């Protein structure tokens, strides 16, 4: 029986390979490579050859991964090129990094900023003071220690020793004091924003857009865009009810001396919080449906009784409502407005209303024409009777429900016709046929409405009992 350790030692001696220590890992790998039988374990020649080939290939791969001296020199030259200043193209002296990530010599960057306050590489405007590049400083020390040809001028000057001096002639110190060192929170979506550029913050201590450094002191709280929203909540949490504003806003005033650029007037409140807006006691310009301004001069606010009556067109020929035994059709008024006016006159006369008095005074002035109008109406009725009698002699007269009137005009004595009021003739004829006495209302029917020229008409009734 061949032992595993001795078998492995023999294999290594034949191949002139280095000796390996006997450990558990090697024994496990050898067990996997050497097949075993049920009774005894023997080393197989095929398994031994496979094991030797795997060892040789792994050693050759490890030798290829080790870089040569030429490759190391090329890599070192690239690192030295990276550590050069983009302005003077020399090794960095007191390296300082801007908020956009570019590194320059302090003296080179200072001279550049005096001419243009922007990054020399990307031309981004610089809001904050560049910071010392400590990591670049350590890398330069490592490179200088490994290569004697690397310049060491100014490297030994630690930039941390220059922190107390006024850097960059104080051109960034005054500008930084105008902004609060706390975080601004957008009240609409709750997004953290930078106090200088209002850019959305991913890092709560640094703005990636403008490089603004945000203080992490305990006294520095979060500022809200709208200072009137959280005044009550902040006051209750801090136990300060004596001050009348948002505590965070007051802190911003104390830090800067004036309101931040994101502060808004006190009356700029949100529309969904239900606050009482400034000027809410004034009359609203947005009225609901059916509402109107009572002070509007274009709207007539008088009562109905104070309005003038509406004039209606007068149809002189009235429709046929019936006939007498002689075959003469009685003239009757069907104008409901005139009947309502007469009923209204009765009520006003009985109640002693003031409107009746004013109308009577107006009608009194036109009372002199009433006699002439009544005589004219009588003449027209007589002419109508004559025409009807003559027509009845020529053709048989029959009365039925289908009787109708056929008006026609006559130019005879047209110049003697006088003007009359609205509905006067139809009301006069209707009252006479009904036996109604119009003498007490003589002044009423002669109202002072605009009169129009009337034309004389005649009524002829053509009826037949049987159709031939």
From Swiss-Prot:
One of its GO terms (biological process) is proteasome-mediated ubiquitin-dependent protein catabolic process. InterPro entries: Znf_RING (IPR001841), Znf_RING/FYVE/PHD (IPR013083), Znf_RING_CS (IPR017907). It is found in: Nucleus. Residues 1-22, 386-468 are annotated as: Disordered. Residues 417-434 have a biased composition (Polar residues). Transmembrane segments: none annotated. Residues 386-402 have a biased composition (Low complexity). One of its GO terms (molecular function) is zinc ion binding. GO terms for cellular component: mitotic spindle pole body; nucleus; site of double-strand break. Gene3D superfamilies: Zinc/RING finger domain, C3HC4 (zinc finger). It comes from the Eukaryota. Keywords: Metal-binding, Nucleus, Zinc, Zinc-finger. Signal peptide: none annotated. A zinc finger (RING-type) spans 85-123. PANTHER family: RING FINGER PROTEIN 127 (PTHR23327). This is Uncharacterized RING finger protein C548.05c.
